[in-house]
Amino acid sequence: MNYASILEQIRGDLQPFLGTGKVADYIPELATVPADSFGMAIVTASGEIFRTGEADTRFSIQSISKLFACTLAFQLLGDALWERVGREPSGTAFNSLVQLESERGKPRNPFINAGALVVTDVLCRRFVQAETALVEFMRRLTGETSIDYDSRIAQSELQHAHRNRAMAHFMASFGNMEMPPEVVVDAYCRQCAISMSCVELAKAALFLTNHGVAPVTGERILDTSSAKRLSALMLTCGTYDAAGDFVYRVGLPAKSGVGGGIVAVLPGEMAACVWSPALDSNGNSAAGVLALEWLTTYTGQSIF
């Protein structure tokens, strides 16, 4: 497969669409990123790297961090994790509180904010600094020791985290928080503020294409069954309440973030990451979704 030429074709075709949408502005630091930025990378299961545009520019991974936080929590608890967070699509916005009342403080899945807060609570219970543990995990997955979180973005998020605090306190009232809500929200905002590039995120997700083993180090991250299950959750819940449309158009398990990144995996073949910060109405990168749709169209590769 000539991924290099396909990426260049996607980049050329995408030019009229760059900047379409709106950069996230409820986190002020994110609003400063140029809306027409674009990068895309593919890392194959054999370790080959293909890139186009600003594929080596680091950006705020935001909700993509939920995938890797969930991986760590799954390592720690196994299936016991699902006693505290569900595995169903929510059908509501990623920061909605609506279902928490009727479902007694158990979030629908680990990729909406409420579910990610429960996952972060698990990590805070296990690690002195959950966000540091996640940063170290990302460094191990990629071999890049300079990966870290952006303290300015973390502070910006903390100043505007009222809804996340409300969710954490609400779940605590149902007994689904073991650590103080403020500690959990602080760690959550810092993990969302991790900065990585398209190449680095594709490398990090590669274990999902390789039966749970990170090709960079040979480390087993998850057993084969757990890697399959985590990929299934990405497919059904990874792109907010647009997951059905995303699967229809793209046909790959993926996790998106309001920083404009989307990471996607094709088991046994490759991991891809695209970044373009202008978002559609669901909080997914508008150009990013289109780029991944064209990737599976031009290559003829998807899980279906």
UniProtKB/Swiss-Prot annotation:
InterPro entries: Beta-lactam/transpept-like, Glutaminase. Its EC number is 3.5.1.2. It holds the Pfam family Glutaminase. It is an enzyme of class 3 (hydrolase). GO terms for molecular function: glutaminase activity. GO terms for biological process: glutamate biosynthetic process; glutamine catabolic process. PANTHER family: GLUTAMINASE. This is Glutaminase. It comes from Paraburkholderia phytofirmans (strain DSM 17436 / LMG 22146 / PsJN) (Burkholderia phytofirmans).
